[in-house]
A protein has these predicted regions:
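Pre-recognition alpha-helix immediately N-terminal to the DNA-recognition helix
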Residues: 228-236
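Conserved beta-strand hairpin/beta-sheet module of binuclear metal-dependent hydrolase folds
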Residues: 1-51, 153-164
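Metallo-beta-lactamase
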Residues: 138-227
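C-terminal regulatory/interaction regions
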Residues: 235-297
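Aromatic/hydrophobic pocket-lining residues that form the small-molecule binding cavity
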Residues: 69, 187, 271
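Active-site HxH/HxHxD metal-binding segment of metal-dependent hydrolases
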Residues: 39-133
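Active-site neighborhood of phospho(di)ester-bond hydrolases with catalytic His/Asp-centered motifs
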Residues: 34-38, 56-67, 84-87, 143-146, ...
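A short catalytic or substrate-binding loop motif that flags glycine-/basic-rich loops and adjacent residues
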Residues: 17-20, 126, 145-148
C-alpha cells in the first residue's frame, strides 16, 4: 500500500498506511493526532510523517485490540507520543485477571503476548468523561461499548466520528459469519446509538469513510446480521447441550472453524457471548442437569 494522506473536512483527514485507514487531525503546524495506529507494524508510517515535518502528539485508541495498536511502540520511540484509551481497556491489557474474565477462551500464551505487547504507558479516559482536550482542540468522547469493554468513538473538532470496530463496514457486513463482540447486548445498544447521531462523516475501521446519509442503512444491516446469527445458533439446538457442545456445533454448523487455535479462541469467546445474550433475552433456557449446565430452547 502506498502511504498517503487524504483530506476529509477542515483539519481532519486520514492516512492510508499499516493496512488500515488511520483518522488524523492536525493540531497545529507541527503536531497531529491519530485515532488508532494501524493494523500492521509499518516503519514507512514514521518516515511519511517525518517527511511532512510533523510529529504525532497523541494516539486516541478506540480500543486496545492488537489490530489497532500496531505502531504505538515506534510512535512513542520516535515522537514521545501519548497513548490514550478508556480505563477498562488499559486494565484489560495490563491484568491477567481481567483477561481471564474477558477472554475466557483465549489461550494463556496469547494472553501473555498481550501483556508484553502493551508494556508501555497508556493514559486513561475515565467513565463519564465527555471530552478530551489535546493542546487547544477538544475531541468529543462517544461510548460505544460492546466490541470490547471500553470501546470508544471519538469526534474530531470538525465533526467526524471515528467509530472503531463498533460497527462493521459495508464490505465486512456482507461477508462476516461471526464478527467478534465481547458483549452482544452492549454492541446492539451502541449500534442503535449511532442511529441517533448526526455527523457529516463517519470513519470506520479499517478502510472506509461514510457520509451521514449512508449510516442508517449500514446500522440496519449490522443489526440484521447479528439477528441472523442468533437464529442460526438457535436452529442448531435440538436437545439441551452443554456450552462446549454448542460452541463446537456452531463452529462446524456454520463452517467457521480456523486452523489457527488463537483465532479459534476468539471465535469460541464470541460464540459464548452470543449464547449468554440469548439466555439474557429469554430465547435460550439455561438448565442445570446432573451437575451440568445445559442450554435448550
Amino acid at each position: 500500500m502506498d502511504i498517503r494522506w487524504i483530506p476529509l473536512v477542515g483539519k481532519t483527514g486520514y492516512i492510508l498506511a499499516a493496512g488500515a485507514l488511520i483518522p488524523t487531525y492536525i493540531l497545529n503546524d507541527r503536531e497531529i493526532v491519530l485515532v488508532d495506529s494501524g493494523l500492521h507494524y509499518d516503519p514507512g508510517l514514521v518516515s511519511f510523517i517525518r517527511a511532512v515535518d510533523v510529529s504525532v502528539y497523541a494516539v486516541l485508541q478506540t480500543h486496545l485490540h492488537e489490530d489497532h495498536v500496531a505502531n504505538n511502540r515506534i510512535l512513542i520511540s520516535r515522537f514521545g507520543t501519548r497513548i490514550i484509551a478508556h480505563r477498562n481497556e488499559v486494565e484489560a491489557v495490563h491484568s491477567r485477571q481481567k483477561m481471564r474474565a474477558s477472554w475466557s477462551e483465549i489461550r494463556p500464551e496469547t494472553k501473555d503476548k498481550y501483556l508484553r505487547t502493551y508494556s508501555y504507558g497508556i493514559e486513561s479516559i475515565e467513565n463519564g468523561q465527555e471530552e478530551i482536550v489535546l493542546r487547544d482542540s477538544a475531541f468529543k468522547i462517544v461510548p460505544l461499548y460492546g466490541h470490547s469493554e471500553g470501546h470508544l468513538g471519538f469526534v474530531t473538532p470538525d465533526g467526524v466520528l471515528c467509530t472503531g470496530d463498533a460497527i462493521l463496514s459495508p464490505a465486512l457486513v456482507q461477508h462476516s459469519k461471526m464478527p467478534y463482540f465481547e458483549d452482544i447486548g452492549q454492541s446492539i445498544d451502541s449500534m442503535k446509538k449511532l442511529l441517533q447521531t448526526d455527523y457529516p462523516y463517519y470513519a470506520l475501521a479499517h478502510m472506509e469513510v461514510l457520509e451521514k446519509r449512508d449510516m442508517p442503512g449500514l446500522v440496519k444491516k449490522n443489526l440484521a446480521l447479528l439477528e441472523r446469527i442468533h437464529v442460526d445458533i438457535l436452529e442448531l439446538i435440538n436437545d439441551p447441550v452443554t456450552l462446549d457442545e454448542l460452541v463446537v456445533s456452531v463452529m462446524y454448523g456454520l463452517g467457521i472453524r480456523f486452523r489457527d487455535e488463537t483465532r479459534n479462541g476468539y471465535l469460541r469467546n464470541t460464540i459464548s457471548q452470543r449464547v449468554r445474550y440469548l439466555v439474557e433475552t429469554g430465547r435460550l433456557c439455561k438448565i442445570k442437569s446432573d451437575g451440568e449446565i445445559r442450554y435448550g430452547r
